[in-house]
C-alpha cells in the first residue's frame, strides 16, 4: 500500500512539473540540458554521492545533516514560493511566510509529511525549470542514469547508505502500515529525471497540436503514453521491491519505460523523423506556446 501512495505522489509530481514546464518564464530561469550536460549528469551525481558517503563514514553525521537540511530547506522555500507564483506583494509575503513555517516545522520535528511537502516543491520545480533540448538528449540522459542506478544500488552500498543515512527533503517517505517505525521511500531522482522526459513530451505535444490540422484532438498522445509507461514502471519497481525484499534501482525500470514509450508512439504514428528533429526552447516553440495560451 505504501508503494501505491508513493507512486501516486510521483505521478502527481511529474504531471504538475510537466504542465509548469510549458508555461512562459523569464529566459534566465530556464536551464536547458543538452547532450554534453546529459553525459555529465551521472558523473557529477556519482561524485557527489561518493563524497556524501565518505562524509557519513568519516565525519560527524549530525553536522553533515544539519548543513544539508539547511541547504535543502532553503532551496525548498524558494521552490515553494515559486509554486504559488504570487503576483502581488501580499501574495509573495503570504507564500514566503507559509513556506518558511513549513520548513521550520520540518527542521524542528523532522516530520515525514513536512519533508514530503518540501520535497514536492523541489521536484515539481526542478522538472519545470530543467528542460531537455531533444528526445535524443533525454534518451541519452536516462540511458546513462540506467547504468548509474544499477551500479550504485547493486554494485555498492553507497546509494542505500546515503539514502537511509541522511534525513533531508530529497525523497518521498511514508511510514509502513505494518511497522510505522520503518519508512518506505522514493528518491527525487527517480521522479525528476524521468519527469524531464515527460515534460519534453508535453511540450512536444503542444508543438504538434499547434502545427497539426489533421488530428487536433490527439495533442496529448506522447505525454499520455509516456505518463502511462512511467506509471507502469513504478508498478514494476514496487513489485520488484516486494518480490526481492531488497532495495531496487528504480531507474532500471523507469528509464526504459520513458525512453521506449515516445519511440513506440512515434513509430506507430509514422512520426519518428518529427520526434527526432524536435528541439525544445526554440523561438518557434515559444511562439507556439504563446499562441496556444491565447486560444
Curated annotation (Swiss-Prot):
| EC numbers | 3.4.23.-
GO CC terms of this entry:
cytoplasmic side of endoplasmic reticulum membrane; endoplasmic reticulum; Golgi membrane; lumenal side of endoplasmic reticulum membrane; perinuclear endoplasmic reticulum membrane
Pfam families in the record: Peptidase_A22B (PF04258)
Cytoplasmic compartment residues: 22-35, 85-89, 131-139, 205-221, 269-295
Q: Which residues are listed as membrane-spanning?
A: 1-21, 36-56, 64-84, 90-106, 112-130, 140-160, 184-204, 222-244, 250-268
Keyword Transmembrane helix found: yes
Spell out the protein name for this chain: Probable intramembrane protease C25B8.17
What is the protein's species of origin?
Schizosaccharomyces pombe (strain 972 / ATCC 24843)
**Upper taxonomic classification of the species?**
Eukaryota, Fungi, Dikarya, Ascomycota, Taphrinomycotina
Amino acid at each position: 500500500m505504501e508503494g501505491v501512495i508513493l507512486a501516486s505522489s510521483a505521478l502527481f509530481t511529474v504531471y504538475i512539473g510537466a504542465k509548469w514546464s510549458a508555461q512562459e518564464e523569464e529566459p534566465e530561469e530556464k536551464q536547458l540540458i543538452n547532450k554534453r550536460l546529459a553525459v555529465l549528469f551521472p558523473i557529477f551525481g556519482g561524485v557527489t554521492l561518493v563524497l556524501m558517503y565518505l562524509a557519513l563514514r568519516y565525519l560527524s553525521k549530525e553536522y553533515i545533516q544539519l548543513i544539508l537540511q539547511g541547504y535543502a530547506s532553503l532551496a525548498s522555500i524558494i521552490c515553494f514560493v515559486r509554486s504559488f507564483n504570487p503576483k502581488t506583494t501580499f501574495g509573495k509575503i503570504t507564500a514566503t511566510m507559509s513556506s518558511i513555517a513549513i520548513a521550520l516545522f520540518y527542521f524542528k520535528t523532522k516530520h515525514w509529511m513536512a519533508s514530503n511537502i518540501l520535497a514536492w516543491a523541489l521536484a515539481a520545480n526542478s522538472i519545470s525549470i530543467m528542460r531537455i533540448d531533444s528526445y535524443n538528449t533525454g534518451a541519452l540522459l536516462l540511458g546513462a542514469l540506467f547504468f548509474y542506478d544499477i551500479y550504485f544500488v547493486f554494485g555498492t552500498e553507497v546509494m542505500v547508505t546515503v539514502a537511509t543515512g541522511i534525513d533531508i527533503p530529497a525523497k518521498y517517505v511514508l511510514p509502513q502500515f505494518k511497522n510505522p517505525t520503518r519508512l518506505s521511500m522514493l528518491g527525487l531522482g527517480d521522479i525528476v529525471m524521468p519527469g524531464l522526459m515527460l515534460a519534453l513530451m508535453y511540450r512536444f505535444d503542444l508543438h504538434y497540436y499547434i502545427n497539426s490540422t489533421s488530428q487536433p484532438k490527439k495533442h496529448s498522445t506522447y505525454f499520455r503514453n509516456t505518463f502511462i509507461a512511467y506509471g507502469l514502471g513504478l508498478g514494476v519497481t514496487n513489485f520488484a521491491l516486494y518480490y526481492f525484499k531488497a532495495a531496487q534501482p528504480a531507474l532500471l525500470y523507469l528509464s526504459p519505460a520513458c525512453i521506449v514509450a515516445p519511440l513506440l508512439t512515434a513509430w506507430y504514428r509514422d512520426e519518428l523523423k518529427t520526434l527526432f528533429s524536435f528541439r525544445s526552447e526554440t523561438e518557434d516553440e515559444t511562439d507556439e506556446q504563446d499562441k496556444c495560451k491565447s486560444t
